[in-house]
Amino acid sequence: MDKFLIDVTVEIPKSSKIKYEYDRKTSQIRVDRILFGSESYPQNYGFIANTLDWDGDELDCFIFADQAFLPGVVVPTRIVGALEMVDDGELDTKLLGVIDCDPRYKEINSVNDLPKHRVDEIIGFLKTYKLLQKKEVIIKGVQSLEWAKKEYQVCVDLMKQYGKLPKDEFIAKMQKLHPEHYQK
């Protein structure tokens, strides 16, 4: 099986309660908020440059690793699957990957190779981390590596075609052109 390697820029270290977010306009990682509840990120979390997901931000990725990485660090990541998710009415895919330069993860090549409990931790986190904000997150399913590759390519194409639009304009345009990706 061919490896699907991508550089992922870390926004949020594993175990953090701080929600950092990349700002494409300024090319900086900013503090977005402190999580409202007692949750913390179960794995490192970041974005993939030159991609645009349906929520108007770069495509997101959880990186399974034993270490917590600093915001802004680029981690070579082997993508193994994805979570298909709807966040506050917008499709917001989360790719799932493992650090590629750690031999402890060399045997993990698909989402089925990950410990189920670790995937369930991420699902549980995503279902609950916005409850106190009164926002709904729906996990539609755990998806395969092939599905993740296709979603990645869609997000690369969206960035090429619409990446210069402000986020609000992009979402408004996509809601008209592709209402199937929005539940508002």
Swiss-Prot record:
GO cellular component: cytoplasm
Top-level EC class: hydrolase
Record: residues binding substrate: 19, 33, 45, 129
UniProt-annotated location(s): Cytoplasm
SUPFAM superfamilies: Inorganic pyrophosphatase
Molecular functions per Gene Ontology: inorganic diphosphate phosphatase activity; magnesium ion binding
Keyword Metal-binding: yes
Name of a matching Pfam family: Pyrophosphatase
Co-factor requirement: Mg(2+)
Protein name: Inorganic pyrophosphatase
Gene transcribed to yield this protein: ppa
